[in-house]
Amino acid sequence: MVTVQMTLDRMKHTKCQDNSARQNLFSSLRQHVSHLEMADNTAQLSCDLPDLDAALSGGVRAGYPHLVCGHLHDGAATGFVLALLDKMIMQNPDAVFIWCAAPYAGLQGQLSARGIAAHGISPAHFIFIDEQHPMQLMAAFEQALQTKSVTAVIAEYGVMHQRPDLWQRWIRRFRRAARTSGAFGLLLGADAPAAGLETKWHITSSCYQQAPESSQWDEWPGLWDVELVSARGGRPYRNMLVWDRISRRFRHLPAQHQNSVPARHIYQSAASPAFSAQPVSA
């Protein structure tokens, strides 16, 4: 903080007409504040892949809200969030998650205990909050995000992002709440503005052009087109990633499947022999 105060003192004594010097000082101040914020990080969740972790400046940061977007009727975004939660359990076997959703908010139906167990996660880690009213749902997410004993809080926000004024107001509140508890905040839904959020992801299902070799996988693992749209202090990233439920790790798509395509192209071109593989989602 001494450096920040020294920079502010220098700005006071810089002549108004010397715009170049003032701009340099502002730039120096912004960089120093950014370094302080990054140093304030208490926990990061590695995504197993050096290139993705580098784009995230180390990993997914705890104590901040993150946005995970997907297409309607595509469970990939939900599957990606569950994969992140599974990795949190690897770090903390006693992890507790609060999942806030309205019946109409889900991208692909409602999450069930049986579905969570099928993903390889014990439902005992979850507390579910069902709330019909969108504003009450956001309030529940904020309150849960302030709870220090919670590892992560997830909210399926439905149509809340369609009100930009309310959306930005809630994002500011979520950011303060997450900083209070140090928990991961995960907002799950359709494409929404990312201002004020730590990261924005866009996750869609993809399809194998041929079945994975049995010697490599006993089943077809989730294959996702993962796009890191924005990351504070990081950079954009996009790649086809496989979620291996056995090792509980993200992996790059093997070379023999590099021609795999987004699942939506399969649906749009179902009659074409070039798109014959079955889609794999969450």
List where the protein language model places each region.
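Detector for small/aliphatic-rich hydrophobic stretches
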Residues: 1-99, 119-124, 272-282
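Helical mechanochemical/support elements of P-loop NTPase systems and associated helical scaffolds
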Residues: 48, 77, 108, 137, ...
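Localized chelating/binding microdomains
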Residues: 72-75, 90-93, 103, 117-118, ...
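Conserved RecA-like P-loop NTPase ATPase core
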Residues: 52, 68, 126, 153, ...
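Conserved inter-motif catalytic segment of the P-loop NTP-binding fold
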Residues: 93-152, 156-162
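C-terminal regions of RecA-like/P-loop NTPase motor modules
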Residues: 1-19, 24, 209-211, 232-282
